[in-house]
């Protein structure tokens, strides 16, 4: 595994992608932003992924649940952390994700990522 963990960041808002990339890269992770569009999403080719941040409320024609299933199929060992303004993990996501962080709490986000990545490395 690489010494620098890579975090796949999935959101439909390019501003949020930029912000979360800055946050994860501020502590040495490598941010890999993927924007969800009406055409779907394109995962990076040949890039290792150690963890995934996934926005729960996507405005395009795909749900976070469907995206999480795609992520698990492509990166089965990468833990998924849901980012949301809701208060708890939705039932349909509970068995798929390993973390949940409310938006606006970068300290908790980084703590969660560090813990999950440390378990893998």
Predicted regions and their residues:
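Two-component/phosphorelay signaling modules centered on CheY-like receiver
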Residues: 14-32
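Conserved phosphotransfer cores of two-component systems
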Residues: 45-47, 70-77
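As written
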Residues: 92-101, 105
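Acidic, metal-coordinating helix/loop segments flanking the phosphotransfer/catalytic sites
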Residues: 32-51
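Conserved phosphotransfer microenvironments
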Residues: 54-69
């Amino acid at each position: 595994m690489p010494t620098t963990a890579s975090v796949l960041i999935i959101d439909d808002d390019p501003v949020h992608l930029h912000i979360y990339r800055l946050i994860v890269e501020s502590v040495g992770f490598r941010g890999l932003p993927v924007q969800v569009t009406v055409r779907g999403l394109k995962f990076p080719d040949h890039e290792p992924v150690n963890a995934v941040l996934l926005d729960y409320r996507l405005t395009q024609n795909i749900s976070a649940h469907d995206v999480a299933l795609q992520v698990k199929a492509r990166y089965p060992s990468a833990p998924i952390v849901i980012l949301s303004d809701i208060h708890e993990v939705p039932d349909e996501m509970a068995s798929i994700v390993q973390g949940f962080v409310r938006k606006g709490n970068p300290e908790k986000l980084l703590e969660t990522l560090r813990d999950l990545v440390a378990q893998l490395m």
